[in-house]
Amino acid sequence: MKNIKTTVFGMGCFWGAEEVFRKINGVVSTEVGFMGGTIKNPTYGQVCRGKSGHIEVVKIDYDPEIISYDELLDLFWNNHNPTTPNKQGWDVGEQYSSYIFYFDDEQKLIAEKSLEKMQENTDLKIVTIIEKAGSFYPAEEYHQKYFMKKNNSILNF
């Protein structure tokens, strides 16, 4: 069996975040959902109303022999604005915050170095939070692979 690893990113609306990663060679699967927060199994409505403290995230299972964690981080940084707190584009709210959730010390170290490198290249403050992964709560089915199902060309990734 292959050595599949997992990472979770919060980078605004999870529909677009999933679309960034789902077609990448080496990504085995993606799933959108919620992390952080104060209640178990939150609904999309609870998260959007700001009542749960959760972040919209994309969970990515990947084969590190095909794509590295560094490469996934590059996609993360290049597909959202890590300098705007609680906001991505038109989407405003705590649930749209920039987060990297790590699963082990190696991911933590790589993520921290990656953030330092990003900060060196901008005068703006990077507000991305790096945090140990906790419980992942999948979003409702209609949110999964949203743009693929809708065949929506609004996003040009």
Swiss-Prot record:
User: Can you tell me which residues form the catalytic site?
Assistant: C13
Q: Name one GO biological process term.
A: protein modification process
Q: Does the keyword Cell inner membrane apply?
A: no
Q: What class of enzyme is it?
A: oxidoreductase
Q: Which reaction does it catalyse?
A: L-methionyl-[protein] + [thioredoxin]-disulfide + H2O = L-methionyl-(S)-S-oxide-[protein] + [thioredoxin]-dithiol; [thioredoxin]-disulfide + L-methionine + H2O = L-methionine (S)-S-oxide + [thioredoxin]-dithiol
Q: List membrane-spanning regions.
A: none
Which keywords does UniProt give here?
Oxidoreductase
This protein's source sits in the domain of life called Archaea
Q: What is its EC number?
A: 1.8.4.11
Q: Which Pfam families match?
A: PMSR
* Gene Ontology terms, MF aspect: L-methionine:thioredoxin-disulfide S-oxidoreductase activity; peptide-methionine (S)-S-oxide reductase activity
Q: Which PANTHER family match?
A: PEPTIDE METHIONINE SULFOXIDE REDUCTASE, PEPTIDE METHIONINE SULFOXIDE REDUCTASE MSRA 2
- Could you tell me what this protein does? Has an important function as a repair enzyme for proteins that have been inactivated by oxidation. Catalyzes the reversible oxidation-reduction of methionine sulfoxide in proteins to methionine.
Task: Please report which protein family the annotation says this sequence is part of.
Answer: Belongs to the MsrA Met sulfoxide reductase family.
Protein name per UniProt: Peptide methionine sulfoxide reductase MsrA
Question: What species is given as this protein's source?
Answer: Methanococcus maripaludis (strain DSM 14266 / JCM 13030 / NBRC 101832 / S2 / LL)
